Amino acid sequence: VIAIQVWEYSNSLHFCANACHDVHPEEIPAYEDSYHSNVKCVECHMGRVGTLNNIILKASHFKHLPAVIFDSYERPLESETMRPANESCELCHYPPAFHGDGVRHITRFGTDEQNTQKDTYLLMKTGAGTEEEGQGFDIHWHVSSEVEYIATDEHDEEIAWVRITLPDGRTVEYNDVTEPLMPEEINEAETKTMDCVDCHNRVGHPFPPPEDLVDRAMADGRLNPALPYAKQLMLDLISASYGSEEEALEAIEEVKVQYAAAYPEIATQYPNELEAAAEVAEDLAAQLIFEDPEVSWEDFPDHNKHKDFAGCFRCHDGKHLTDDGESIRLHCNICHSVPANVGGEEPPPAVPLGPLDEPDYHLETNFIADHRFQAD
């Protein structure tokens, strides 16, 4: 009975967070802020494997004990390997399942005095499914098809070579023409098969950029846009370098006093909102300030988007070409519709639900690059 209880405890969040991974305390709040906060650590990091395999995997981690004991581990802490998606992600998220298009509404605010609101509407084409069902396209095509790649860096941010295997067995290879790999280099390099975490690499421990966190706080009402320059001040506060969390809290309190002095009417009219803004600043600072001052959210690239990191553009950049000069498709409407932007007080725009009526040359793989030069 005791052995069973010890085993169950070794699979708990409390054990992982305190006994082992207190070495990187920021990972735990990030995990709790993720969509997978009700999924046990071991289900992703060990995979849903049998008990014997789980014991072997855990035993292999004893090699990290000296680094923990002598405080000599690397920062930021990185996982050398992740369990394959078919032992973790795919046991909940079945690749052949088809997902219909979904409407995304993104609210952002300006850094001007009025915190001008801008709403973006677009259709996300998640897709997937199987070729036999007449599907197997859009974003999740990448995991319902066989896609291999070679990265030249340890974070998979620099993709040098890509190979796809077509349903009929034929293969198509794309090489980065700016720094092409030679055939012998391709043969010797580690080739990886694309799976869920090649895009969703921060799904369990997200470290969003400061601007995204502030926009979210303003959109959900925690930070009132009626406070002049609220976004800019918040960004200045949470993006500054602090020696400790206590130092950040002191800076927040000082700015709150200065703000009330600069805008006495606002402080009188919105006293509760001003206090709430200080609380938001404290929460965001705690989320963004790392124990090691040399580490920040920028050390944790998120491949799921392409605003703050290369993400999709690691491959869809117009530079990966076949021997015939065909590129990996680079279009504004492959994964989502063309974004429609409106002001905060304007009604939502009409977003087309079906395919656009485009001329044939819009579908050419090099269209975006050619269009840019033609427009210039």
Predicted regions, residues:
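Short sequence/structural segments immediately N-terminal
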Residues: V1-D376
